[in-house]
Curated annotation (Swiss-Prot):
Belongs to the SecG family. This is Protein-export membrane protein SecG. It holds the Pfam family SecG. GO terms for biological process: intracellular protein transmembrane transport; protein secretion; protein transport by the Sec complex. It comes from Corynebacterium glutamicum (strain ATCC 13032 / DSM 20300 / JCM 1318 / BCRC 11384 / CCUG 27702 / LMG 3730 / NBRC 12168 / NCIMB 10025 / NRRL B-2784 / 534). GO terms for molecular function: protein-transporting ATPase activity. The gene is secG. It is found in: Cell membrane.
Amino acid sequence: MALTLQIILVVASLLMTVFVLLHKGKGGGLSSLFGGGVQSNLSGSTVVEKNLDRVTILVAVIWIVCIVALNLIQTYS
């Protein structure tokens, strides 16, 4: 059980990193470093941004649940 949660935690961490980097930059952040500042004016549907926000929040919730579950398993085993 703990091994499965650890694997899910690693995958969720990687996915969350990718999803956060995919967000449009609102300033001089990391996304504008890779050319996101130029593309943000040319493309970007609000539906895509909302879906990306939802997926990012879902992955963050999965990440938090895995951390809490692993802590509980470690505490009570």
